[in-house]
Amino acid sequence: GLLDILKKVGKVA
């Protein structure tokens, strides 16, 4: 879901 993407991006960024 979008939340998963946000969490992944937030983790990388």
Curated annotation (Swiss-Prot):
Disulfide bonds: none annotated. Expressed by the skin glands. GO terms for biological process: defense response. The modification Alanine amide is found at A13. It comes from the Eukaryota. The keyword Secreted applies. One of its GO terms (cellular component) is extracellular region. Keywords: Amidation, Amphibian defense peptide, Calmodulin-binding, Secreted. GO terms for molecular function: calmodulin binding. It is found in: Secreted. Belongs to the frog skin active peptide (FSAP) family. Has no antimicrobial activity. Inhibits the formation of NO by neuronal nitric oxide synthase (nNOS) at micromolar concentrations. Acts by a non-competitive mechanism, probably by binding to calcium/calmodulin and as a consequence blocking calmodulin attachment to nNOS. In vitro, does not exhibit cytotoxicity towards 60 human tumor lines. This is Lesueurin. It comes from Ranoidea lesueuri.
